[in-house]
Amino acid sequence: MDMKGTYLVTVILLVSTLSVGMCSNGWIRAHATYYGVNDSPASLGGACGYDNPYHAGFGAHTAALSGELFRSGESCGGCYQVRCDFPADPKWCLRGAAVTVTATNFCPTNNNNGWCNLPRHHFDMSSPAFFRIARRGNEGIVPVFYRRVGCKRRGGVRFTMRGQGNFNMVMISNVGGGGSVRSVAVRGSKGKTWLQMTRNWGANWQSSGDLRGQRLSFKVTLTDSKTQTFLNVVPSSWWFGQTFSSRGRQFV
């Protein structure tokens, strides 16, 4: 490649990097807000369908992501380290503070050039998470940097059975490592083949087969391509609404 070609490639890469606000050390520029003081468990589940993030293993440090980050639910359960850009906003940012949040919700767009509109990178955080990096009294928005990090979870991966009749759906939560799930397959004890599940919404996956009265095994692949198989994690006596754990087997 001649020097002109090398220069062109360099310029293209530089423009691509600047377009998403990426820094040379891996941090990406974004903005953050918080969605109020009502952080009861029932108010934090959101578009990922976790219902109660505390029961799902995520605690109070959660966030709704803009569409650019949420990716139609693919980021549900993923972890992000967020720090306030103190040099850009020393009045409201806490110097050197960072917090790790779990993606549990979607921050919707609006017709008023909102912060969550595409292609913006934005975190609408729970107030406990937000005030780990910003001063209290701030009711506006702060500039931040973020990066994707591994999730540290206690206990095993959790499988919550949902649906009714022969409509089977499972909500997968408390996932360590990469945190966010790319694909799921299920196998009942009466069958020999894995059935590929489809994302119904958020962290909820559905299958087309009737799996009632069977022990269930799941093959879970994360967005970082790591896969684990959880054999017979759900007993044949399962019913809708019950949650089962992989008993310590976890992604790292």
UniProtKB/Swiss-Prot annotation:
Report domain Expansin-like CBD positions. Answer: 166-246
Span of the secretion signal?
Answer: 1-23
**What subcellular compartments does it reside in?**
Secreted, Cell wall; Membrane
GO biological process, alphabetically ordered: anatomical structure morphogenesis; plant-type cell wall loosening
Claim: Membrane is one of the keywords in the record: yes
Its placement in the membrane is given as: Peripheral membrane protein
What top-level branch of life does the organism fall under?
Eukaryota
Q: Which InterPro entries match?
A: Expan_Lol_pI, Expansin, Expansin/allergen_DPBB_dom, Expansin_CBD, Expansin_CBD_sf, RlpA-like_DPBB, RlpA-like_sf
Per the database record, which ranges form the Expansin-like EG45 domain? 45-156
Name the keywords, alphabetized: Cell wall, Cell wall biogenesis/degradation, Membrane, Secreted, Signal
| Keyword S-adenosyl-L-methionine on entry | no
**What do the Gene Ontology cellular component annotations say?**
extracellular region; membrane
Q: Which Pfam families does the UniProt entry name for this protein?
A: DPBB_1 (PF03330), Expansin_C (PF01357)
Function of the protein: Causes loosening and extension of plant cell walls by disrupting non-covalent bonding between cellulose microfibrils and matrix glucans. No enzymatic activity has been found.
State the family named in the UniProt similarity comment for this chain: Belongs to the expansin family. Expansin A subfamily.
Under the heading PANTHER family, the entry gives: EXPANSIN-A15 (PTHR31867)
Protein name according to UniProt: Expansin-A12
Provenance organism: Arabidopsis thaliana (Mouse-ear cress)
Write the gene name: EXPA12
